[in-house]
């Protein structure tokens, strides 16, 4: 029987869903063991006097009986159960909580909106990569949290009384997806936002991160439809028009939208459009974690790392016994190549980061077998938990590793949506060349090289006589030129 003392559980009694997260602490980071989510729709059980109906409470207790079974193996000091907006509001919350505590065998804490916002921010800070200065948006069932911060520190926290369940009951009660219902829902959301908008804008942000079911649903829709993963106002408006075209909630069909998420999708969409409009948000990406992750990391007292992606890469290198010196060597060559062609190819900083990340993991497939190592690498990266990387970025890394050597599978580079297809091709070319020139596994054997780009033509200049002195290297480069030419990537080597 394994020790249970490294297990931690976080339970979030939300207004729309109840969630449970069980993790194990491994070398200063967390490994997810269980995630259970049940749609309880507690907020829908509030009447005009803010009393919870017996049916809604029973739905909640039924869900907690499922959770209780899993909690039996975990020390009570390593369990945190929090309740949010609906139980802050309900006049008979005490009745619900008393029974909930009896079922779970541990305390249930009703947290304030500000504390909820702080925990959400901590969950994002521990699990989401990108710029340090961020705005975090979480649309819950009955409240919406908006938080600005830098690194681990919050600079402003707001919890607003609007959510996808309450807005559904208020503005889409007739289940009609007409323009007038959307207009009313957006107008009301903007009025709720207006008093806090100035302070949020004053603190500012470099990156905006969404941490809710609505944003998760948008991500799933965009992945299913082959769009890039950045959420923009234009995409939100397109989805709204699609919803209006469907006419009624029970007839809402959007490629990638699950039945489970469909009910509260239009109301969440209206709130998100209002947030984008009122705060002039350019684009948003999906967070790696939120409230439950904030609770877990709080219990573990782990510091927020400056660079979550680096922590993730280090942990994976250790776990799969990757040769770190070689990974760094390849990364150094790739970075040098990238810096030489960046201007001509109009590449962005995030592309450089993703190329370096691919270099750090490029030999992960060897931990399975040398034979088909690129396929093993792609499979592992696609299926590993990579905090700090978005789902689309994971897919790009897997695709680059699949194409690190041998003939190029162009269609796979075009199927990812983290970067435009042309950029994926360019990063792939740089990775392949870096692996070749670092293959001797010694810093002093990496030649001084210049790489020039002229549209798609790459010209690589090596030291005089290098090709003559390195017949195997010459053969490998000739083979690489041929493979690149098959997919119309011209490569000249001098």
From Swiss-Prot:
Pathway: Purine metabolism; ppGpp biosynthesis; ppGpp from GTP: step 2/2. It is an enzyme of class 3 (hydrolase). Disulfide bonds: none annotated. GO terms for molecular function: guanosine-5'-triphosphate,3'-diphosphate diphosphatase activity. It comes from the Bacteria. Its EC number is 3.6.1.40. Pfam families: Ppx-GppA, Ppx-GppA_III. Transmembrane segments: none annotated. It catalyses: guanosine 3'-diphosphate 5'-triphosphate + H2O = guanosine 3',5'-bis(diphosphate) + phosphate + H(+). Keywords: Hydrolase. GO terms for biological process: guanosine pentaphosphate catabolic process; guanosine tetraphosphate biosynthetic process; nucleobase-containing small molecule interconversion. The keyword Hydrolase applies. InterPro entries: ATPase_NBD (IPR043129), GppA/Ppx_hydrolase (IPR050273), Guo-5TP_3DP_PyrP (IPR023709), Ppx_GppA_C (IPR048950), Ppx_GppA_N (IPR003695), PyroPPase_GppA_Ppx (IPR030673). Belongs to the GppA/Ppx family. GppA subfamily. NCBIfam families: PRK11031.1. Catalyzes the conversion of pppGpp to ppGpp. Guanosine pentaphosphate (pppGpp) is a cytoplasmic signaling molecule which together with ppGpp controls the 'stringent response', an adaptive process that allows bacteria to respond to amino acid starvation, resulting in the coordinated regulation of numerous cellular activities. This is Guanosine-5'-triphosphate,3'-diphosphate pyrophosphatase. It comes from Shigella sonnei (strain Ss046). The gene is gppA.
